[in-house]
Each structure stands twice: as structure tokens, then as C-alpha cells.
Swiss-Prot record:
The lineage of its organism: Bacteria, Pseudomonadati, Pseudomonadota, Betaproteobacteria, Burkholderiales. NCBIfam families: PRK05255.1-1. One of its GO terms (biological process) is assembly of large subunit precursor of preribosome. It comes from the Bacteria. It is found in: Cytoplasm. The gene is darP. The keyword Membrane does not apply. Keywords: Cytoplasm, Ribosome biogenesis, RNA-binding, rRNA-binding. This is Dual-action ribosomal maturation protein DarP. Member of a network of 50S ribosomal subunit biogenesis factors which assembles along the 30S-50S interface, preventing incorrect 23S rRNA structures from forming. Promotes peptidyl transferase center (PTC) maturation. Residues 1-27 are annotated as: Disordered. Coiled coil: none annotated. GO terms for molecular function: ribosome binding; rRNA binding. InterPro entries: DarP (IPR006839), DarP_sf (IPR023153). Residues 9-18 have a biased composition (Acidic residues). It comes from Bordetella pertussis (strain Tohama I / ATCC BAA-589 / NCTC 13251).
Amino acid sequence: MSSHSQEPVGEENFDDSEYDRPNKSQVKREMHALLDLGKELVELSPERLRQLPLEERLYEAIREAQRTTGREGRRRQIHFVGKLMRSAPAEAIRAQLDTWRNGSREETAAMHRLEALRERLLTDDDALTAVLQRNPDADIQHLRALIRAARKEAAANAALSQGQEPQRKQYRALFQALKNLSA
């Protein structure tokens, strides 16, 4: 027998303060999340990338991945981007990406509302009254002229034979005027 005594390793003597690091599966999930975030960044335009809090080395790695055309080379470069993402402010980047995604949904919804308003203006004269009540400083003569021209354009488009391109100039001009009113 040995001269020094060893304490038995049992649950009562187990000190888990030494093992407070995340387990291997958790680390792997985090690395895959960073890799997925890196893949999203590779799909962004250079202008959008410049708006993110990225280190220059990470920015250049992303741009290189965007330029790489070979499948395996691109995969390797994206994995390198994922590795560099470990030191990047991932939460700030995710927050900005979410803002861009949700902001574009809001913009799309606003565009749909304007399109519906334009359709109401073309079919219902009372819709113009509602627009003018919400925007008392709007140029009523200009709006009426645009509505008249868009209605005339729609009537001319209805008379076109199949295969002819319809005119949309006044239709678009009315939309732009409504967009400027809402801005």
C-alpha cells in the first residue's frame, strides 16, 4: 500500500467548479451559429457590409468569399469567415440584420398601403377627400390632375389589343405623389 492516502472519487467529493466551461455540444452549436451568420454576411452587398461593426480582416475575408467562384474554395472561405466571426460582435451584427429584415417588411407593408390608396383614388372620388383631410397642405390641383391623367391612361390601356404594352407613367406618378405625401 502506498504511504499517502487518496480520497475516493465519489459524488460527495466531486467539485464541479473546475468544470464550468460549456460542453462540447454547446460549443459546436455556437460555432455553427457563427458559421450561419457568416454565410448570411457573404450574401450582403459591400455597402451593407460597411455598415456593420466588422474588423477589416473579417470584411476582407467576406469580400474574398463573395469573389470566390469554386465550390470547395468558397466553402473553405466561408468556414474561415466563421472562424473570424468568433472574435466579432455577433449580437450587434445579428441585431442590425434583424433591423434590416424587419425594416424592409415595414416598407413593403407601407408600399402595399399606398398601392391600395392609389387604386381607391382611381375608382372612388371620396378617397381624395380622405387623403386631403389627412394631408391638409397637399396640392389638391396636382393630385386631381394626376388622378385624371391616371384614369385616362387606364382607359387607354383597357382599349389596347393583346400584346401591346400598357402605359404606366401617370399611374407611377400618382404613386410617387402619394409616397411623398406620406413621407
